[in-house]
C-alpha cells in the first residue's frame, strides 16, 4: 500500500446507513489492542474555537516539556495535519503502516466503521506508538456520540463557544447542542466551559453536577485586550500579562483564556505547566486558516468561519483590523448552512463578492450562491474554479483587502492558488 492507496481507503468508507454510536469505534479499537487506554487526554468540544483552543493547549503543553498528541479536523492542505505529535504531522510512511494495521480489523467488522471512526483509530494508534504524555483530542461532531468519546477518564473536558450549527444532527435549540457537547463530561473529571449563553450554561452545569465533575467557567472579566495589529493581538488574562498572540482574530484572546484556564486546572491536578510555558506556547502557536493573513499589502486573508456564529466573530475582526475598509470577499458556503444569515453579516463590509464551490458535494454551486448575494443588492460573480476565483478576487481587490471565507474545505486550494498567483 502506498500513500495514495491509504487515502483512497480512508475516504472510501461511506457514512450512509450508519447509526450514530460508539459501538463500532469500541469494537475497532478493541481489535487493535485498545491503544486509547494507554493515553491521557484533554477532550475539546464546542461549536467554534475548538480547533484554535486545542492548538493553543498542545503548544503550551509541548512548551512545558511534554510529548503532546494533537487530533483535529478538518485538514487545510494535507490529511496528515489531523494527527500530530509535538507539532509534527504524522509522516506518510507511518500513516500507511497504520492504515495497513487498521484495514483488516475494520474490514472484518459486520458493521463497517465510518471514515471518522477509522481516522480516530489511526490517531489513537499513532499517539500510543509515540508514547505521548498527553493528547489534545478535538471532537469531530457534537460530543455524546462522537467517536472520540470512547475515552473514559480525560484529564479535563473543555467546551468552547457554543452556537447554532449542525442542528440536523444535534437538535434545533442551544440546549440540545449543549447537551450533545456536554456528553464529553465524565464522572469526576474537571470541566472548563466558555459559557456566556444562559440556555446552554444551564445544561452544562446540570450535567457536570450529575457527573460530580468540577466545573470552571472562564471568567472573561479578567481578560483585557491591549491592542492588535496584523502581526499579533496583545492581551492580559488573570495575572498573565502582555501575551502577544500570533493568531490575530479579535476573538482569539477569548480562546486563549479558555486554554489558560484549562492549563491551570491541569496544573492543579499535578501537571507541571509553569506560566512561562503558557506564555511561550501561546506566543508560538500556529493554526492556519483562521483569520490568517497570507499577505500584508494589499491584504489577503484566509478564514475558515463556516456558520453564522463564527462569521459574526470574523466580521468583528475585520472591522477591528481594517477600520473603514470594504472587502472583496471570495466565498464558498456549504448548502446546509444558514447561508442568508452569513451573507447578511458580510454584506455591509462588501465591495464585491466572487463565489466558488469548494471541492465537496455539500458546497452550494457558485452561481446559486451568487444569486443569493445579488438578492442583498451586492455585486457578485461566479467563478468556474477556485483558481479563477482567487485570480478574479485579487484583480477586483486592486490595492484593497481581499478575504476568502465561508468554509475550511477550500482553504488549502485557496492557499495554493494564491501562491501560484503571487510567485515570481
Regions found by a protein language model. Give the residues of each.
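Hydrophobic alpha-helical packing residues
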Residues: 57-62, 127, 266, 346, ...
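Acidic, Mg2+-coordinating active-site environments of NTP-dependent enzymes
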Residues: 110, 118, 131-138, 154-239, ...
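ATP-dependent carboxylate-amine ligase catalytic core
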Residues: 18, 22, 26-37, 63-152, ...
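N-terminal leader/targeting and accessory segments in enzymes
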Residues: 1-48, 52-67, 76-78, 131, ...
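Active-site-proximal loop/hinge segments that shape catalytic or ion-binding/gating pockets
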Residues: 407
Amino acid at each position: 500500500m502506498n500513500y495514495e492507496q491509504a487515502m483512497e481507503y480512508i475516504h472510501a468508507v461511506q457514512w450512509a446507513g450508519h447509526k450514530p454510536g460508539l459501538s463500532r469505534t469500541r469494537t475497532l479499537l478493541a481489535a487493535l489492542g485498545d491503544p486509547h487506554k494507554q493515553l491521557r487526554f484533554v477532550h475539546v468540544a464546542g461549536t467554534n474555537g475548538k480547533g484554535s483552543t486545542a492548538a493553543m493547549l498542545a503548544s503550551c503543553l509541548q512548551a512545558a516539556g511534554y510529548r503532546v498528541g494533537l487530533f483535529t479536523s478538518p485538514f487545510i492542505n494535507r490529511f496528515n495535519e489531523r494527527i500530530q505529535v509535538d507539532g509534527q504531522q504524522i509522516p506518510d510512511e507511518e500513516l500507511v503502516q497504520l492504515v495497513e494495521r487498521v484495514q483488516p480489523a475494520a474490514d472484518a467488522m459486520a458493521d463497517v466503521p465510518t471514515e471518522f471512526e477509522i481516522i480516530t483509530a489511526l490517531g489513537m494508534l499513532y499517539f500510543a506508538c509515540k508514547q505521548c504524555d498527553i493528547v489534545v483530542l478535538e471532537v469531530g461532531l457534537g460530543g455524546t456520540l462522537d467517536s472520540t468519546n470512547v475515552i473514559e477518564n480525560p484529564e479535563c473536558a473543555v467546551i468552547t463557544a457554543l452556537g447554532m450549527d449542525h442542528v440536523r444532527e444535534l437538535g434545533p435549540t442551544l440546549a440540545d447542542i449543549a447537551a450533545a457537547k456536554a456528553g464529553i463530561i465524565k464522572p469526576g473529571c474537571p470541566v472548563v466551559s466558555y459559557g456566556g449563553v444562559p440556555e446552554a450554561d444551564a445544561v452544562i452545569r446540570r450535567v457536570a453536577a450529575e457527573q460530580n465533575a468540577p466545573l470552571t467557567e472562564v471568567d472573561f472579566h479578567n481578560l483585557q485586550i491591549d491592542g492588535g495589529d496584523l502581526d499579533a493581538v496583545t492581551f492580559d488574562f488573570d495575572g498573565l500579562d502582555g501575551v502577544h498572540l500570533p493568531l490575530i482574530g479579535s476573538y482569539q484572546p477569548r480562546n486563549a483564556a479558555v486554554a489558560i484556564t484549562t492549563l491551570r486546572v491541569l496544573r492543579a491536578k499535578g501537571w507541571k505547566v509553569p506560566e512561562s510555558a503558557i506564555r511561550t506556547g501561546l506566543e508560538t502557536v500556529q493554526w492556519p486558516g483562521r483569520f490568517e493573513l497570507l499577505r500584508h499589502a494589499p491584504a489577503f486573508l484566509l478564514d475558515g468561519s463556516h456558520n453564522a456564529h463564527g462569521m459574526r466573530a470574523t466580521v468583528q475582526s475585520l472591522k477591528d483590523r481594517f477600520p473603514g475598509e470594504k472587502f472583496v470577499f471570495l466565498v464558498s458556503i456549504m448548502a446546509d448552512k444558514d447561508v442568508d444569515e452569513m451573507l447578511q453579516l458580510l454584506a455591509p463590509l462588501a465591495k464585491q463578492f466572487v463565489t466558488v464551490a469548494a471541492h465537496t458535494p455539500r458546497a452550494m454551486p457558485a452561481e446559486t450562491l451568487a444569486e443569493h448575494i445579488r438578492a442583498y443588492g451586492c455585486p457578485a460573480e461566479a467563478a468556474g474554479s477556485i483558481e479563477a476565483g482567487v485570480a478574479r478576487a485579487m484583480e477586483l481587490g486592486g490595492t484593497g483587502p481581499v478575504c476568502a471565507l465561508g468554509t475550511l474545505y477550500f482553504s488549502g486550494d485557496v492557499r495554493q492558488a494564491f501562491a501560484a498567483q503571487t510567485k515570481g
